[in-house]
């Protein structure tokens, strides 16, 4: 059994595991 997280960013969901690096789009906050 592996430990993982599901991250929602930029309208996408990404599954990441321990020690894994991901790249996400830069999110510009709305003023």
UniProtKB/Swiss-Prot annotation:
Which InterPro entries does this UniProt record tie to the protein?
bL21-like, bL21-like_sf
A GO molecular function held by the record? rRNA binding
- Which of UniProt's keywords are assigned here? Ribonucleoprotein, Ribosomal protein, RNA-binding, rRNA-binding
- Listed transmembrane segments: none
- Superkingdom, taxonomy of origin: Bacteria
Cellular component, GO, one term = cytoplasm
Q: Of which family is this protein a member?
A: Belongs to the bacterial ribosomal protein bL21 family.
Describe the task this protein carries out. This protein binds to 23S rRNA in the presence of protein L20.
The subunit field of the Swiss-Prot or TrEMBL record says: Part of the 50S ribosomal subunit. Contacts protein L20.
What name goes with this protein? Large ribosomal subunit protein bL21
- Gene coding for it: rplU
């Amino acid at each position: 059994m592996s430990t993982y997280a599901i991250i929602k960013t930029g309208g996408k969901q990404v599954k990441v595991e321990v020690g894994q690096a991901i790249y996400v789009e830069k999110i510009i906050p709305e003023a």
